[in-house]
Amino acid sequence: MKYVIILGDGMADEPIPSLNGKTPLQAADTPTFDYMAPRSRMGMLKTVPEGFHPGSEVANMSVLGYDLPTTFEGRGSLEAASIGVDIERGEMAMRCNLICVENGKIKNHSAGHISDEEAAELIAFLSEKLGSDTVRFYPGISYRHLLKIRGGDKRIDCTPPHDVPGTPFREVLVNADVPEAEETADLINDLILKSQVLLANHPVNKKRIAEGKDPANSIWPWSPGYRPSMPTLAERFGIKSGVVISAVDLIRGIGVYAGLKPVAVEGATGLWNTNYEGKAKAAIEAMKNNDFVFVHVEASDEAGHEGDVALKTRTIEYLDQRLCKPIVEAADRMQESVRIAVLPDHPTPCRLKTHTSNPVPFMIYSKGENADGISEYNECSAINGSLGTLETDGFIKELLK
């Protein structure tokens, strides 16, 4: 048996008036999901344990069945693994967004989805001006970068910028949870303020403003953590070989710690215009020689953060017709059985423009296996699935059993 997870980040939503009370998943034209649904077992998955923030790092680790209270160490350390940055003892890693601040308020978490090339130039500039033996910046993709602090204390309260669009940034600066962490909080806040001065008149931002684009005029570090201790899927379930396919450093980093080999796909952007066909082709190729394939698509999440209902619906259709369809067709042709799961990691409702902790719908498809006979796959239908509501490692064990 081979196993494939197709994860549409943030794909789940809530009923939307402009869609006649349907969710984007219900409203989208999804012939592949419609084919899979009556041939699948369904259920709901609680991906955000009590006490955890509904971030993609938490939710994707939950999908893979990790025990969050014992393994979670923040987003930064996971993303570091993806870009080959080692987190040593005594070092703290953080996600470091490039964001847009306008009139003292956070306009968006992505600096208008700044390009990789522009972002790399800005991160190199900040590294030159603000870097030291204590502070290191590392470039990632688009607005997503890495900050490493030697001697940093993770006991700080950091606000994810995508949770607070329109909020005065000074209201959500870093706070220490314990007195011992005040030095770390002060250091990070100082870096934020200094970055704003340095970036205000940088040529990259002057050019972006002239083109009518949002400037990347501030950094925003968040999700601190140390090096995680995560057993691999091979150690936990005997998976002999597997790959992770994603445009997002976070997901590739989770894959690295899970023992999965990252596969790069040209044109994978993390946005609606990602290379769906390229990802499908990479997954089909990986299925030939691997037991486990994890395909992650970010597009629906970004559309949800923008509150763009039409775009989110379209990204679900692209996922269905341009990625799922060729993978399912290839799986059905293989001599060896293939079990395919489709699910989001968390909802990103367009109304809220941020993540929620609500359980997400999943279906597990395999040609010739017992099925629930439910005609559609969405947030409402999956509630009636035979697998009920799962949590912790319930989903991954059900997939791999």
Which residues does each PLM region occupy?
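Feature captures the catalytic ectodomains and active-site-proximal regions of enzymes
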Residues: 1-401
